[in-house]
Design a protein with these regions (language model features):
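A short, N-terminal "cap"/entry segment at the start of jelly-roll beta-barrel domains
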Residues: 1-25, 60, 71, 110
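Short acidic-glycine-tyrosine-enriched beta hairpin
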Residues: 64-80
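Ligand-binding loop in jelly-roll beta-barrel domains
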Residues: 71, 80-103
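Short peripheral tails and domain-boundary helices/loops at the edges of structured domains
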Residues: 102-110
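Conserved short histidine dyad/triad with adjacent acidic residue
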Residues: 27-44
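Short, surface-exposed secondary-structure edge patches
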Residues: 30, 49, 65-68, 85
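Histidine-centered metal-chelating micro-motifs
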Residues: 38-39, 58, 76, 80-85
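Glycine- and acidic-residue-biased ligand/ion/polar-headgroup-sensing regions
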Residues: 46-60
């Protein structure tokens, strides 16, 4: 069992990210975005669940065909190979659960 209690603000001039948890089954990433910073649209070979922990962001949905604003407490789910990305409307923190865990060379978020 692991308990993770920290929710530190780690903003920078670029989107900041950290691996919160990682094993062969799942990867949990936390992203820190200042207003106007974005994670560019990309695809993952895995299912992706993203929860907004703090702030407000604009998310691509419906395989990139539309956008949706999500606030703290909201969650979005993406199927494998579905186009997704997000842009911060205000300083924000999001957590992504990716399952199954893709290999490092397949996860391209830059």
């Amino acid at each position: 069992m692991s308990v993770i209690k920290r929710l530190e603000e780690r903003y920078g001039e670029k989107v900041q990210s950290e691996v919160v948890y990682n094993n062969e089954h799942a990867r949990v990433l936390r992203f820190y975005l200042r207003a106007e910073q974005e994670v560019k649209p990309h695809k993952s070979p895995s299912s992706v669940f993203i929860t907004v922990l703090k702030g407000k962001l604009l998310f691509l949905v419906n395989d990139g065909k539309s956008e949706e604003i999500l606030n703290a407490g909201d969650t979005v789910f993406y199927n494998p190979e579905e186009l997704h990305g997000f842009k911060a409307i205000e300083d924000s923190i999001v957590e992504a659960v990716i399952t199954p865990n893709p290999s490092v060379n397949k996860l391209n978020i830059s």
